[in-house]
Amino acid sequence: MICVCLLMLMTPMAARADITLTFGTYAADKPTVTVKKYRPFLTFLSNRLGEALGEKVIIRMTVAKEYQEGIDQLASGEVDFARFGPASYVHVMKQNPGIQIVAMESKKGRKRFKGVIVVHRDSAITELSDLAGLSFAFGDELSTIGRYLAQSHLLEAGIDSDDLHTYDYLGRHDLVGEAVGAGKFTAGALKESTYKKLIAKGVPIRILASFDNVTKPWLASSTLPENVLLAMREIMLSSENEEIVRRVSKNGFLQGSDSDYDLIRDAMEQSQAF
């Protein structure tokens, strides 16, 4: 969805058009945290795009309540570009193969980082196999770490859904960690950065296991004009040393390709046996 807003001028000269873009994401953590995280970078990006395109660029932001809502918004062109988790990228490509990767987030120059499975700090559990007969908290049903990679990892340890006493999907990563810390579930899966934030807040959890994940892609809708996509990509790939960029991607961005997410496709396929 790309809108053109006309400036009303006091002269009969042709009005200059502003480019208005909508950025979309979903709340893997609290929505207020999500907005606070991205707004400064989006302001930076709109200014740089304006310089590159020679037109004023306005970027609006929308935060979907659920993963599927965010996926649908990008697939339909309701938003022009988005930041998704890897599994959401795989899903949105199935809905609209015209989606393109703008760039991937960098983790110290790499395209991989860690997801974690946690237990209560005082838990006696030392192995994933110890979870048989106990409870597990997953994130969203479409979450890369919170579902697909966690379930794949559990399967490798010989644990499937029938082996658990109970399990549930809690949505956000922070809710998973808090539930485990409160003793509502024996274990749960969340991203490492959220784990560190919860530890800093005093939530009594510890890491039982960790696993590789692929960094998040920034994606362009199939309707985003090519010149805007190319300008956005150039800005993101050349801005790794900008402090404002490090707020959303600590080490900047890398060139991305569809094959970077084969690890996730494999995990999603494996999780069907869970």
Located regions from the model:
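N-terminal hydrophobic or amphipathic helices and topogenic motifs
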Residues: 1-78, 246-274
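Bilobed "Venus flytrap"/periplasmic-binding protein-like clamshell domains
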Residues: 18, 22-48, 87, 111-177, ...
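Periplasmic-binding protein-like
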Residues: 18-31, 103, 107-119, 200-242, ...
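Sec-exported extracytoplasmic/periplasmic mature domains
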Residues: 46-54, 75, 79, 155, ...
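Short helix-initiation/N-cap motifs at beta->coil->alpha
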Residues: 55-72, 87, 161-178, 213-214
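Short helices/loops that flank or line small-molecule/ion binding pockets
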Residues: 64-82, 95-96, 129, 173-185
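Short beta-strand-centered segments that line the small-molecule binding cleft or hinge
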Residues: 80-82, 89-114
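A ligand-binding cleft/hinge motif common to bilobed small-molecule-binding domains
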Residues: 83-96, 153-156, 178-206, 210
